[in-house]
Amino acid sequence: MSRINLVTTEQANEQQLVLFSAIEQQIGIVPNFLKVFANSPAALQAFLGLHSIASEGDLDTKTKERIALGLAEQNACQYCVSAHTALGKGAGLSGEEILANRAGSSQD
């Protein structure tokens, strides 16, 4: 089976390093899925632009994570569920709330 590899910091070219630096400044790390996107800097830049647009608006972080948890579960994306569980906990969601969000409901 073909596999798309991660772009590591050691392998990254100048353009990729600039993008990695911007990601690290925003969220503290470069998640593996973004290291895969870095195989195409244009795709990574487009994703970051979309993420920036989605981050704007009036919804608070908890609400955004509640929505992301429900979508991740519906998409059957275990990577996304794991990531948004951690982000949800960081935003102050309880374990019970996270389970409710994954089931498409909320205690709030």
Q: Which sequence ranges carry the predicted segments?
A:
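Hydrophobic alpha-helical segments
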Residues: 1-108
